[in-house]
Amino acid sequence: MEQCRKSFPEGFLWGGATAANQVEGAWDADGKGPSLADAMVAGTHQLPRRITLEIDESRNYYPSHSGTDFYHHYKEDIALFAEMGFKVYRMSINWPRIFPKGTETEPNEAGLQFYDKVFAELKKYGIEPLVTLYHNEMPLNMVTAMGGWVDRRSIDCYLRFAEVLFRRYKDVVKYWIPFNEINDLTTAVGNWNHGGILNHGTEDFSHQVDDPDKRYAALHNQFVASAKAVLLGRQINPEFRFGTMICHITVYPLTCRPEDVLLTQQEDQLRNCMSGDVQCKGVYPYYAKRYFERNHIHFDVEPGDEELLRRGTVDFYSFSYYMTNCVTAQKDAAQVSGNIMGGAKNPYLKATEWNWQID
């Protein structure tokens, strides 16, 4: 019997990850514009998070405004990463720190200089950067002026942002993720934080008004933007490597009833598999097309989009894991919360004080 390894193999990239909107703070420093994350008020166990397009720090607490103050303490933080033995650090670049409104033609040099210093510090400790281009940091102006990712113009704005980074860091960064947890838009909670969609003035983050046509239009535009970014990046540096990034919530049928088993299969396909299939294989899978048809979901696919998806596939598959869910057709089944989405309560698992089940 082969013994379990007691150490990582040579070249294994062990490390950690952050999102710019969660750690940087300095939300309006050195020319940075507000992002959609900057408009989200903190919640409590009793009160859900809210979205406020008018940012008022005198009345509300916005977590992204301070984060962990990585903007001013990146040197100490990266030194700690090195002390932990990090070989890779996954980070995102805050879009409105580079293009404050998202629609400018010239980038904010002060923002770029900050990331210059971060990459130099990582190099000092031999830590490989893995850069996420979009981690729920769309410039707030693009949300209010365009309606977020539903508008096709967002693709060009994103590509302008991506090109600046690809050219500036073509000899610094090898690994790129165009979109964090791109499959978030297969759920209603993804409307705001991933799509920049504010349906009918939705303010309650946990109970957003959902328009599936808009949501899947935004997701399609992100698929196209990702494919275009991959193709552009490979022109700039053929050694670049791009990956999909999926929020994978493992699902189990609550019972052996055929209805529960079938519903679990469908949930797994749509939430966990579809987005990875599009980005890795370059086509919408048959089950996605069937889902759109059965649920009367319509969005525009422009001439050339399908060819772009075929050509702009990614090189690697990455995912995040939070917890599992159970799925059932029973309407009265006990429910639990979770990150991004909840589900039916698994009677065999314990739960945190936030009602996330532990497994």
Predicted regions and their residues:
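Internal amphipathic alpha-helical repeat/solenoid segments
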Residues: 66-79, 100-101, 111
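A short acidic, glycine/proline-enriched capping/turn motif at secondary-structure boundaries
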Residues: 87, 96-98, 136-138
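A common structural microfeature
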Residues: 11-13, 71, 88
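Active-site mouth loops of central-metabolism enzymes
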Residues: 59-73, 150-153
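Acidic/polar N-terminal loop/beta-strand segments that form early-domain functional surfaces
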Residues: 17-19, 92-96
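Catalytic domains of carbohydrate-active enzymes, especially glycoside hydrolases
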Residues: 73-94, 128, 312-316
